[in-house]
């Protein structure tokens, strides 16, 4: 019900691109279906939509878990991507105009390109971009190609009441004490300025754990901070 007036406003020059943002896959599918219905109701309607999927979910690498970093030297879909993306984009743009996760994956396999990067590049050619909240609100993974500068964009935010919890997660940093221990072990034996700094940081974690443990009886176990829990590692 919200898509139609938003697209109508775009047709009247009130926006160049519509971003439909939701945290739920089912709602993304519903948005895809709504766009498809509008396109079917107006056979001559030139309307393209793409659904963006998180990189780890879209990845086609057969050993993705073994290669958490997206590196051309270990991924055949990333290696030479820019040499092959033009043909992949051309094949998609000659198609139906509705680009789901499955459609991107099929084309990515055909042309041996990264489906995640293909979706990002394709979004520049689409009228409607469907995806998660973080593509707009997360300071680390937001769509820089669109939001690093002002643009004539329209936004539909599904279930916006969920944004405060998501925003807290997006703007919060986490660091585990176990990371310090692993770094110190990696440095091996002997002294170094880096190992000294890691030792000092380790002491800060231990002090925080002690302070939280002492405060826990007063504030209740449910209120103990996440920092306290991670400091036990």
Show the residue positions of the predicted features.
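Secondary-structure transition/capping motifs at alpha-helix termini
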Residues: 11-13, 41, 149, 160
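Conserved small/polar residues in nucleotide/adenosyl-binding loops
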Residues: 227-233
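A substrate-engagement module of RecA-like helicase motors
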Residues: 14-129, 137, 199, 206, ...
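Short, glycine/charged-enriched secondary-structure capping and boundary segments
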Residues: 6, 33-37, 65-67, 143-146, ...
């Amino acid at each position: 019900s919200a898509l139609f007036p938003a697209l109508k406003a775009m047709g009247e020059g009130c926006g160049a691109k519509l971003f439909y943002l939701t945290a739920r896959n089912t709602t993304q599918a519903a948005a895809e279906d709504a766009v498809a219905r509008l396109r079917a109701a107006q056979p001559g309607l030139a309307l393209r939509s793409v659904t963006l999927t998180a990189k780890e979910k879209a990845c086609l690498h057969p050993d993705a878990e073994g290669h958490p970093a997206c590196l051309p030297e270990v991924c055949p879909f990333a290696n030479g991507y820019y040499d092959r993306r033009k043909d992949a984009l051309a094949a998609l743009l000659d198609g139906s105009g509705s680009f789901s996760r499955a459609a991107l994956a099929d084309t990515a396999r055909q042309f041996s390109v990264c489906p995640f990067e293909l979706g990002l590049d394709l979004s520049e050619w689409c009228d409607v971009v469907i995806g998660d909240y973080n593509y707009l609100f997360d300071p680390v993974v937001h769509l820089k190609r669109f939001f690093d500068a002002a643009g004539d964009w329209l936004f539909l935010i599904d279930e916006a009441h969920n944004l405060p919890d998501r925003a807290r997660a997006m703007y919060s940093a986490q660091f585990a004490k176990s990371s310090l221990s692993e770094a110190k072990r990696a440095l091996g034996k002997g002294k170094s300025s880096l190992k000294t700094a890691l030792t000092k940081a380790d002491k800060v974690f231990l002090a925080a754990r002690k302070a939280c443990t002492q405060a826990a009886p007063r504030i209740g176990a449910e209120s103990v901070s996440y920092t306290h829990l991670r400091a036990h590692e």
